[in-house]
From Swiss-Prot:
The lineage of its organism: Bacteria, Pseudomonadati, Pseudomonadota, Gammaproteobacteria, Pseudomonadales. This is Ribosomal RNA large subunit methyltransferase H. It catalyses: pseudouridine(1915) in 23S rRNA + S-adenosyl-L-methionine = N(3)-methylpseudouridine(1915) in 23S rRNA + S-adenosyl-L-homocysteine + H(+). The keyword Membrane does not apply. It holds the Pfam family SPOUT_MTase. Belongs to the RNA methyltransferase RlmH family. GO terms for molecular function: rRNA (pseudouridine-N3-)-methyltransferase activity. Specifically methylates the pseudouridine at position 1915 (m3Psi1915) in 23S rRNA. Its EC number is 2.1.1.177. GO terms for cellular component: cytoplasm. The gene is rlmH. It is an enzyme of class 2 (transferase). InterPro entries: Alpha/beta_knot_MTases, RlmH-like, tRNA_m1G_MTases_N. It comes from Pseudomonas fluorescens (strain SBW25).
Amino acid sequence: MRLRLIAVGSRMPKWVEEGWHEYAKRLPAELSLELVEIPLNTRGKNADVARFIRQEGEAMLAKVGPNERIVTLEVHGKPWSTEQLAVELDRWRLDSRTVNFMVGGPEGLAPEVCARADQRWSLSALTLPHPLVRILIGEQLYRAWTVLSGHPYHK
């Protein structure tokens, strides 16, 4: 089963890349964790932000196959505990479809992306920096896997 983080933004600091890769490599081969970066449109003073969000959303959805699962990361999504995420991860493994976690740009996700969501997940009611969100998602997916496999990392 493939897990993919499709995120708007690229050229992250080295510590973000290192953190992401650390958790991605810890997962077993049958649970591959991939990162797909969507270029962020440059926002200027008179930028058409609505158009940029729409373009970024189209680019995100173009990376998703017709039968793949979409989980959007939204402040108004459902908060999951580690144990609840482990239950979801187990369901996704049984379903065996690719799971795409969608993280929008500074203004959030395009409505078209949200409309395609199978599930909506909230990491926190706090506003989190997008570089940190990448690492959090990787770590939480790894932690959920350790819960399912009885690995001592979670304790």
